Amino acid sequence: MKLKVGFIYGGISTEHEISVISALQAMNNVDKEKYEIIPIYISKNGEFYTGNDLLKIENYKNLKELCKKSNNVAIIKKGNEYCLLKVDFPHKILSTIDIFFPIVHGYNVEDGSIVGYLETIGAPYAESDLYASAVGQDKVIQKILFKENGIKVAPYIYFYENDFINNESDILKQVKDLTYPVIVKPARLGSSVGITIAKNENDVKNAIKEALKYDEKILVEKVVDNLKELNCSVLGDKDSYKASLIEEVTSSKDILSFEDKYLNGGKTKGMASADRIIPANISKNITKEIEEISLKACKLLNTCGIVRIDYLLDTKTNDVYLNEINIIPGSLSFYLWKDMSHKNLLTNIIELGIKKYKNKSRKQSSFESNVLQNFNGTKGVKK
């Protein structure tokens, strides 16, 4: 019997469209002999939909019409089953789901919001858990964690919107102390949205204004000199991680834009469309160092499934800086696994999710006590 896999994608996110592309790539390449595909699309206003019309990329040209053709659903638990309940009257169960596969990108979805709900109802799911997802979405928390554990990160500062409003001159001085040029980022977004390189104080002010459109938490980093951008994917869980080939991302620009990452090769290719050299033109020593850092970073976060870790290399000093980890990478980084088919990669991710669920099911999730039986009024409330 085929396992029913509910692919969750879309959502209230600046990376909504990229999530759609990544999910459709996965649904088109998953092993159809092992798995039954159930699309679960989250609209831009946060409603969940399912239906066969969601499987065709051309239907996403008109999202309003697509949602009308599809069934509005809610993910629920009924008994021991996880179901898609039709929201509109008459209510009915449209499908059961054996395992969920979130392929979501960005704030509000990839940050643990989706897997947090799945955890709440006890549902099995592929990819990393709530904790890794939350840390993976916040570039500042990542840097603090990695630096504390001996992994190099580029010099940086961070602040919140109110900090800048109340202490602009102090923050601008901290930025200047990093030395220009710097890169200004929303701390909890991805896909290069809201990111700007600033070469002077006026640039910094404009860059902060742009980044604040997307997030109240801002990260400013020193631009690495003699820069070469490198990416490495990691597959597995805490028991066994494996690093992919390392790619060198090429661009004539100072920084890869959203368009560079996703649209250069056509609107259906996702991250696979970016200009890249695989394997990267780097020494064996640098390759080994990046692989070792990647496995260490994944162990620290206890990632599961597939992730991508982005690096900055100073080609003059050979210093390697971990830039950020992507908990659910665009296109699931399938293009970095030349020795594994897209189909087998997806099977591996799903099987890791099943293993994670089985391991967690063995742990006690409740504690027997008679507190409620003896509870009388509010006297027993913890103060």
Regions found by a protein language model. Give the residues of each.
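ATP-binding N-terminal substructure of ATP-dependent carboxylate-amine bond-forming enzymes
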Residues: M1-Y131, V135-Q137, I141, Y160-S169
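C-terminal active-site "lid" helix and adjoining low-complexity regulatory extension at the edge
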Residues: N285, T315-K383
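Short beta-strand-to-turn element immediately C-terminal to the catalytic PLP-Schiff-base lysine
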Residues: F159, I195-N200, V234-D237, D314, ...
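Glycine-rich phosphate/pyrophosphate-binding beta-alpha loops
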Residues: G106, S192, S252-I255, N326-K338
